[in-house]
């Protein structure tokens, strides 16, 4: 590998909206990032059903297309 062309590999801190935080190594320019979901609060890993709706997209879809009947 050529010397001096690769980005710096440094520690980055990640904080989830549930309060969980962890550290990992990356080439990101930031020292910390914020996550919406992680393995401690994601429904797949916790086994709890939860709807993650950003901006009311599901409601907007149902409002536009909910009145349509299925084809017979």
Curated annotation (Swiss-Prot):
Keyword set, alphabetical order: Metal-binding, Ribonucleoprotein, Ribosomal protein, RNA-binding, rRNA-binding, Zinc
PROSITE patterns documented for this protein: RIBOSOMAL_L31
One Pfam family of this chain: Ribosomal_L31
A Gene Ontology BP annotation from the UniProt entry: translation
UniProt KW Transferase keyword: no
Residues where Zn(2+) binds: 16, 18, 38, 41
Ribosomal protein recorded as keyword: yes
Entry's cofactor comment: Binds 1 zinc ion per subunit.
Function: Binds the 23S rRNA.
Stated name of the protein: Large ribosomal subunit protein bL31
Protein's organism: Vibrio campbellii (strain ATCC BAA-1116)
Gene of this entry: rpmE
